[in-house]
A protein has these predicted regions:
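N-terminal segments of secreted, surface-exposed, or virion structural proteins that
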Residues: 57-110, 340, 347-362, 436
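Well-ordered beta-strand positions in beta-sheet-rich domains
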Residues: 38-40, 82, 203-205, 304, ...
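Extracellular adhesion/glycan-binding regions together with long Ser/Thr-
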Residues: 2-5, 63-76, 131-189
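Short consensus segments that form the blades of beta-propeller domains
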Residues: 110-114, 195-197, 346-347, 555-558
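C-terminal, structured domain-capping segment
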Residues: 77-97, 101-106, 158-214
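Long, domain-scale functional regions
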Residues: 50, 214-590
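Surface-exposed interaction patch
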Residues: 21, 30, 72-149
Length: 590
């Protein structure tokens, strides 16, 4: 009887302890809805501090014929965010911290008067009408509108992405406390000629939460240690030898690196640039004849790969690479710039793997890792055919089957007229990737004037960059979400030792990008269209050959159809969530 009593008391004690642990847990809820609904959770427990958040509706400005005219007045949008803290009744005190952000997902407005005359102003006030007048990176201004009224706020006329309003703000109470922040965005009507903003849109929401947001661009930049090349990242400032000089952060180098054990086999390079090279670690054979990785073999012919000193015939490039790693001849994952985009599935499907080219003006630029299939880009527009040759340098899902597209089958090398651009990339891709993911992509002003063969194809990267997108570039641009890589994106993705090479040297492969094939993570192994036209003609554009050099060919014709790897920039507000950046552990974003 005594034993039963003891057991009952013990069970009761365990239950009581469990309840104590549960109710002593700190409770808060992260609010990011921006939909005008309360998102707080209240837990009725004597020993709990409750910390909750609430946000108002999204902010929207859209100028149309009804509201955009002389005398119509300013256009405004208003919302709020609340942080609510209640202390437990045991200690009667509570202290917490929170962050408040304005996330601008769309802003197409521009300056119509001059850069000192703001068109959109941001005002932030607390519940007592006290205004915030200092924010890092923003300028607080006072202007007079068309009706003579004074309008104050931060100039956000062309701003996009994430704006930090409150950074780790402390909130303390001995009972309960609510901090409310009222936010207003105002389009200022000056009764001047502001026609440049007709039809423009602005969309944003407040985000209030306990955790600090790490922007993807900041995460990438944080991988740069100050030493060029650490983590395969290079800061292209004015002192980087042979660099772009545009203050971008770019990944460069090969995914695999030859080890001392690999060199001990007699290899001096991972893969060769032609079939006469005898010091490549991995060789490719087509129909029994030695060729080189990058050689295109008919699907009807036999093929295999050999590793130096190994007679095993490997059937795919990936098999040969994996075996080389297992033998200790290569190290892998040298460039950790993989991103999973278009899905939250785990593991990330090959079709959804993208790679970070770099950070440009606080925006992260991606390119698809594998060649896009017609299931993503469609069989309309500038689609040509499914191509069944075996590309020996491809690592994707199907090296023997690629969806091929013309750059512009209409025959001209004007990007704005290309159906690859208008239909396959900026209609089909955008629709097929899904609304949620498409909204994460920024509208980019692409430089599409291209350059001459001598300025881009037979020049070193630093010179080519200036003519393609730099100070000597054409003023021809095109605004769209999706594009293709620039030629110089490809050049600068190779190891710095390649930055003295040219895109193509007819007489010596050791002096062009064939020589750096194994040291360039952006080398895809197939045909790659770039977005840049050959401005020396009316019907040619630049592409990367399967052998890794850069050429210029016709944008149409049955024999000139190539693979496509879509490229785009993410909104600067895109947040880093997790991932090391390897293929098996790609970066996840929000």
């Amino acid at each position: 009887m005594e034993n039963k009593k003891t057991k009952i008391i013990s069970i009761a004690s365990i239950i009581a302890l469990a309840l104590t642990l549960v109710t002593a847990t700190f409770a808060y809820f992260m609010a990011q809805t921006g939909e005008g609904k309360s998102t707080d959770i209240k837990i009725n427990a004597n020993t709990v501090d409750t910390f909750t958040f609430e946000t108002g509706s999204a902010l929207n400005l859209s100028l149309n014929q009804e509201n955009f005219a002389s005398g119509k007045g300013n256009q405004t949008g208003t919302t709020f965010a609340k942080a609510m803290l209640t202390a437990n009744n045991k200690t009667n005190t509570a202290t917490e911290h929170y962050y408040l952000y304005l996330s601008i997902s769309e802003n197409t407005f521009t300056y119509t008067q001059d850069a000192n005359t703001p068109e959109i102003l941001l005002s932030i006030k607390d519940a007592s009408n006290n205004e915030i007048t200092t924010l890092t990176g923003l300028t607080y201004k006072t202007v007079t509108d068309g009706k003579g009224a004074s309008i104050k706020g931060f100039d956000i006329t062309t701003k996009s992405g994430l704006i930090t309003i409150l950074n780790n703000r402390e909130i303390t109470t001995t009972s309960s406390k609510t901090e409310q922040w009222n936010v207003t965005v105002t389009f200022v009507n000056y009764n001047s000629n502001q026609a440049g903003n007709a039809g423009k849109n602005f969309t944003a929401k407040l985000m209030i939460q306990k955790e600090k947001i790490t922007l993807l661009a900041d995460w990438v930049i944080s991988q740069y240690t100050g030493t060029q090349g650490d983590n395969a990242l290079y800061y292209h400032n004015s002192t980087l030898t042979n660099g772009a000089g545009d203050n971008s952060y770019r990944y460069a180098g090969g995914d695999y690196v030859l080890t001392d054990a690999g060199k001990a086999t007699g290899a001096t390079m991972m893969i060769g640039y032609n079939n006469t090279v005898t010091t490549a670690l991995i060789d490719f054979y087509c129909n029994g004849t030695k060729q080189y990785v990058g050689y295109r073999c008919s699907s009807s012919q036999t093929h295999y790969y050999l590793i130096k000193g190994d007679t095993t015939q490997y059937q795919t490039y990936n098999e040969a690479l994996s075996a080389s790693v297992e033998k200790g001849y290569l190290t892998k994952d040298n460039v950790k710039n993989f991103v999973c985009f278009g899905t939250d599935a785990s593991p990330c499907p090959t079709e959804n793997l993208y790679r970070i080219i770099g950070v440009f003006n606080n925006q992260v630029k991606l390119v698809k890792w594998d060649y896009a299939k017609s299931s993503l880009l469609g069989t309309d527009g500038d689609f040509s055919q499914e191509y069944s040759y075996y590309f020996s340098g491809e690592q994707g899902e199907s090296p023997s089957s690629n969806s091929m597209y013309y750059w512009n089958n209409a025959g001209t090398n004007t990007w704005s007229e290309s159906n690859l651009n208008k239909i396959n990339l900026n209609t089909n891709f955008v629709n097929n990737i899904g609304t949620i993911w498409a909204k994460k992509i920024a509208t980019t002003t692409w430089k599409v004037g291209g350059g001459t063969w001598s300025n881009i194809g037979t020049s070193v990267p630093k010179t080519a960059y200036q003519y393609e997108v730099g100070s000597n570039a054409s003023t021809t641009t095109y605004e769209a979400k999706i594009g293709l890589m620039y030629v110089t994106d490809y050049y600068y993705s190779a190891s710095p030792s390649a930055w003295t090479l040219v895109g193509y040297n007819e007489s010596d492969a050791t002096k062009d990008y064939r020589f750096s094939k194994g040291e360039n993570w952006l080398y895809g192994g197939g045909f790659d269209w770039t977005i840049s036209r050959d401005s020396g003609s009316s019907n040619r554009a630049f592409f990367v050959d399967e052998r890794s050099y850069v050429r210029s060919y016709y944008v149409y014709n049955y024999d000139y159809f190539y693979g496509v790897r879509p490229s785009f920039s993410l909104l600067s507000s895109t947040a880093y969530v997790s991932g090391a950046g390897s293929m098996s552990d790609p970066v996840r974003i929000n």
